[in-house]
Amino acid sequence: AMILAIVSNHNQTFALTYKKGDVLTTRSTSASGLTGHNGIYIGNGKVLDTPRVHHYPRVMSVKKWIKSYPKTKVTRPKNSSLGNKAANNAVKYFKGKKIPYKVTPNPKNIKKTYCSEIVWYSYYKAGKQYMIPEHGVWLPPSIVAPYAFVNKQDVKHNGFKFVDNKW
């Protein structure tokens, strides 16, 4: 099921159709030294994220996300079944779970978690390791930066595309 949201941003109103697995990245916040913030669209008009102030993963409406974080870009895997699997994993591993917020190395360990790790791990469990370049070599990151999901080179290399590329 797709959701159509009318988003009003900088006096422009545009319609955006969200699909499961869409990665929302905002620059409207920063926490624990990480600039930016991520959420993953899980279907039915809902986004899953974990903000520092809330301490545990939470679910909110896309409408509330856009209101809270007006400067948001959206990326999507070119393979829609991968997006579906990742969204289902976000629900399975994080929705309603009392996993404390903390930025720690190794995104495969989710005893503690943070916003971009939730997105990374959900895709990892769907069979996709989102890689970033380190000294010219593409590797899984030790700490996942929120902006990795909107860096043009990273997005392209990992088989994602921009659905909304405007802050």
Per-segment meaning from a language model:
Residues 10, 37, 54-55, 135, ...:
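Histidine (H) residue identity feature
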